[in-house]
Amino acid sequence: MHMPKGFLSFGINIGIKDDTKDFGVIYSEIPCKATAVFTKNNFPGAPVIVGKEHVRSGVLQAIVINSKNSNVATGEKGIQNSREICKIIGESLGIKETLVLPSSTGVIGVPLKMEIILPACKKAKSLLKPGNLEEVAEAIMTTDTRKKISSRNIKTKSGQGTIYGIAKGAGMIEPNMATMLCYILSDVSLPEGTDLYSILKSSVDQSFNCLTIDSDTSTSDTVALLCNGLSGESSVQDFSKALTEICIDLTKLIATDGEGATKLIELTISGAKSEAQARKIGKSILNSPLVKTAIYGGDPNWGRLIMAVGKVFDEPIPFEGLQIYFGTLPVKEANPETLKKLSEYLKNNTEISLNVVLNVGTISMKFWGCDFTEKYIEENAYYTT
């Protein structure tokens, strides 16, 4: 994958929890046009509070991330710690602290180990290497089992530019504005006056906001976009298309890596009367433990799907017109022969296509999730012990 020009980074272990990478910095040689979307959880993490302040100007030049500790529910001291991290990173890189976006992910309610984080911040400049974003993708992982990376090359007036995205997330995921942690870096610029926030929000709404693993909205969700323009100007249309594709790629990688997951579920809701209706029903289906466990076990129990559609009380769907398919196989009122084929489809595929046709309108949307296994219970029952 091509790396965007002008970005340097590193990802290292500093011992926050164990011997895996847990600290990373991304730095642009010049200030970037920037925007971000954040969690709507009522208890946002300290880095989210500080990050909102710093991105308000529309300019950022660096991102600092630690994993294994989210700096959430840590009070005023947690906010002070996030500010101090930005200050020391800024001093190391020779930039204003307000040009630094902080992020933290991991266990909630535990103070940051500032005695090991601040020395790492002081060394930041000496650790930077050109590109190197795969290291950061590893450093932001918590219960993730793999790095999540996607990129696209796009045309610019002076040749070609790159958009490069990294993300983390495997549990505590049902976004409401952003989701998990995601950093998207680009060396292209956009025409003067372009609303970068609207472009990012549109891409997020078509991707991360259509994702759920366990219906829990994290306190740390952040999606940030930084563009330094070193490869020239791109059209808004080309940029938006590539950005949305990257966000969908990362969404699917997160769903595939859901804690304990064995199957990616891609759900299409079609024939909805509105996007709001499609979202409610789509999330109801993918959040249902009964649906998720049935898919895991290869059990084509179509009654559970009917239940998940029907429990959206404020969006009643006529039963007669409702159609449901796994792949191309009809589910509703399936006969024994079809049920056998459905079971084989669920058992033999790691990517499950689920199509629900409401037949009350013309709106169509895609959603992503995963199955629900014993390993999810094991992972989360003993997370802090």
UniProtKB/Swiss-Prot annotation:
EC number: 2.3.1.35, 2.3.1.1
The reaction(s) this protein catalyses: N(2)-acetyl-L-ornithine + L-glutamate = N-acetyl-L-glutamate + L-ornithine; L-glutamate + acetyl-CoA = N-acetyl-L-glutamate + CoA + H(+)
GO molecular function: glutamate N-acetyltransferase activity; L-glutamate N-acetyltransferase activity
UniProt main location, coarse: cytoplasm
Keyword Membrane among UniProt keywords: no
Active site: 179
Enzyme's top EC category: transferase
Keywords: Acyltransferase, Amino-acid biosynthesis, Arginine biosynthesis, Autocatalytic cleavage, Cytoplasm, Multifunctional enzyme, Transferase
Alphabetical list of InterPro entries matching this protein: Arg_biosynth_ArgJ, ArgJ-like_dom_sf, ArgJ_beta_C
Top-level taxon: Bacteria
Amino acids binding substrate: 142, 168, 179, 259, 380, 385
Localisation per UniProt entry: Cytoplasm
CDD domains on file: OAT (cd02152)
Pfam families in the cross-refs: ArgJ
The family this protein is said to belong to: Belongs to the ArgJ family.
Assembly: Heterotetramer of two alpha and two beta chains.
Function, as annotated: Catalyzes two activities which are involved in the cyclic version of arginine biosynthesis: the synthesis of N-acetylglutamate from glutamate and acetyl-CoA as the acetyl donor, and of ornithine by transacetylation between N(2)-acetylornithine and glutamate.
Name listed for the protein in its UniProt record: Arginine biosynthesis bifunctional protein ArgJ
